[in-house]
Design a protein with these regions (language model features):
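NAD(P)H-binding glycine-rich loop region in Rossmannoid oxidoreductase-like domains
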Residues: 43-92
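C-terminal amphipathic/interface module of NAD(P)-dependent oxidoreductases
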Residues: 259-292
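Mid/C-terminal beta-alpha module of Rossmann-like enzyme folds, strongest
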Residues: 208-256, 289-292
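Alpha-helical substrate-binding/gating segment
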Residues: 174-181, 189-223
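N-terminal Rossmann NAD(P)H-binding glycine-rich loop of SDR-like oxidoreductase domains
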Residues: 4-24
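Conserved beta-loop-beta element that borders a ligand/cofactor-binding pocket
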Residues: 111, 145-168
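Glycine/proline-rich active-site loop of Rossmann-fold NAD(P)-dependent oxidoreductases
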Residues: 141, 153-155, 165-175, 206-215
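Conserved Rossmann-fold NAD(P)-dependent oxidoreductase catalytic core, especially the SDR/UDP-sugar
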Residues: 91-133
Length: 292
């Protein structure tokens, strides 16, 4: 059993992960701007403040905090918020851990499959592939670099590159469940995905096995925008149309952010499967059936 501190613990993944960790007998503390529960502690990036009680006898930190990539159009200011919310928060954690002379057993950080860049190709990306040259690649690269500084404190560091997280409430699926379901753009871009339970189980595995390095947390079954949408329509008993939402409409609606809807490649799960990680929901149909 371990004492675990989570940032972003009140979000979609953090809430589920906290529940699963506690069921295993771990003690979980959550950093939040507005603490309400006994296990929640205040932090404020704007003033570089963290309640030091949160670090008492801590073993692991799981860093999930970060402004939503797809919540708002990518203005210059919004891009800065997206990066700073991930990097500055990791820097503040590092400063506090060093200042308090804490011997961490591990630092686990979220990242995204956007590390490889938002592009559509026939290449299947593995963890050793180079970082993408676009904005998503920049975000993930800086995010991961901020996490890797914990290696200087002799703490094992792992980064979890995550695809679309499938959950019953909130997240991408909520926005995709439109009255009529269709693919986006030309429909041929791939959508790396993972069921929230599998994702949380991998975070737990990272702790229990003291994993180090980068890992693609994606399900092994590949889907394009069209095949994903068709499977979603069947699972939710909603009509599916073969006519995709045109790219130009998405670009008008979302600006540069539309790239995350219109581009995507396959991402390999082989590394985590080779570690013996077993997906509870390896196929999209079974994942959606459980959720709906």
């Amino acid at each position: 059993m371990a004492n675990i501190l989570i940032t972003g613990g009140t979000g979609l993944v953090g809430t589920k992960l906290t529940s699963l960790l506690e069921k295993k007998g771990n003690t979980v503390r959550v950093l939040t701007r507005s603490p309400k529960k006994s296990n929640e502690f205040k932090w404020d990036l704007s003033s570089n403040y963290i309640d030091e009680e949160a670090f008492k006898n801590i073993d692991y930190i799981i860093h999930l905090a970060g402004a939503g990539i797809a919540e708002k159009r990518w203005s210059k200011d919004r891009k800065k918020v997206i990066i700073d919310s991930r990097v500055n928060s990791a820097n503040l954690l590092f400063t506090k851990v060093k200042e308090l002379d804490i011997s961490l057993k591990g630092f686990i950080s979220a990242s995204g499959t956007g590390y490889y860049g938002a592009k559509t190709s026939e290449h299947i990306f593995i963890e050793n592939d180079p970082v993408g040259s676009d904005f998503l690649g920049e975000v993930c690269n800086k995010w991961e670099s901020a996490a890797m500084q914990f290696k200087a404190l002799k703490a094992p560091v792992s980064v979890v590159r995550t695809g679309i997280v499938l959950s019953e409430k909130g997240g991408a699926l909520e926005k995709m469940r439109t009255p009529i379901i269709a693919g986006l753009g030309n429909g041929n871009q791939y959508l790396p995905w993972i069921h929230i339970e599998d994702l949380c189980n991998f975070y737990i595995r990272a702790i229990e096995d003291k994993l180090e390095g980068a890992f693609n947390a994606v399900a092994p079954e590949f889907h394009t925008s069209i095949s994903f949408s068709k499977t979603l329509a069947i699972s939710t008993s909603k009509p599916f149309t073969k006519i995709c939402v045109p790219s130009f409409l998405l670009k008008i609606a979302f600006g540069k952010m539309a790239t995350i809807l219109l581009e995507g490649s396959r991402v390999s799960s082989k590394k985590i499967e080779d570690l013996g990680f077993e997906f509870k929901y390896p196929k999209l149909s079974s994942a959606l059936k459980e959720l709906f």
